[in-house]
Amino acid sequence: MQRITITLDDDLLETLDSLSQRRGYNNRSEAIRDILRSALAQEATQQHGTQGFAVLSYVYEHEKRDLASRIVSTQHHHHDLSVATLHVHINHDDCLEIAVLKGDMGDVQHFADDVIAQRGVRHGHLQCLPKED
């Protein structure tokens, strides 16, 4: 491990210290390492051809015209990416789905875009993790 020196604006340093405290980091170095790892992982997952894992979460109205069947159709069309799906009934109208995906990150992003773009899908979020060798 190497020791480096960085220069930060006062406002940015305040934000870093606040983040470190909220997340329970013992020091700034740990927080900066995690932030950097997260940024590098995100960049790696945006490269087509990169293999990895992802979690796609979204809320949808199950009574919306044919929405549930369109989502299922999209899932079946990309069956090779799906590892598991959790379905939660939030209330009478809304469902939360959490899909664990595995494969080429470009294909995973395409699948997520297909689902999130469906009319009636809200709060779509894709969290990607590159496969570590």
UniProtKB/Swiss-Prot annotation:
Cofactor: Ni(2+)
Signal peptide: none
Keyword ATP-binding recorded: no
Gene3D superfamilies: ACT-like. Chain A, domain 2, Met repressor-like
Entry's Gene Ontology BP terms: response to nickel cation
Cofactor note (record): Binds 1 nickel ion per subunit.
Binding site for Ni(2+): H76, H87, H89, C95
Matches recorded under Pfam families: NikR_C, RHH_1
UniProt-recorded Gene Ontology molecular function terms: DNA-binding transcription factor activity; nickel cation binding; sequence-specific DNA binding
The keyword Cytoplasm belongs to this UniProt entry's keyword annotation: no
Key words of the record: DNA-binding, Metal-binding, Nickel, Repressor, Transcription, Transcription regulation
Quaternary structure annotation from Swiss-Prot or TrEMBL: Homotetramer.
Role summary: Transcriptional repressor of the nikABCDE operon. Is active in the presence of excessive concentrations of intracellular nickel.
Family under the similarity heading: Belongs to the transcriptional regulatory CopG/NikR family.
Protein name in UniProt: Nickel-responsive regulator
Lineage, broadest ranks: Bacteria, Pseudomonadati, Pseudomonadota, Gammaproteobacteria, Enterobacterales
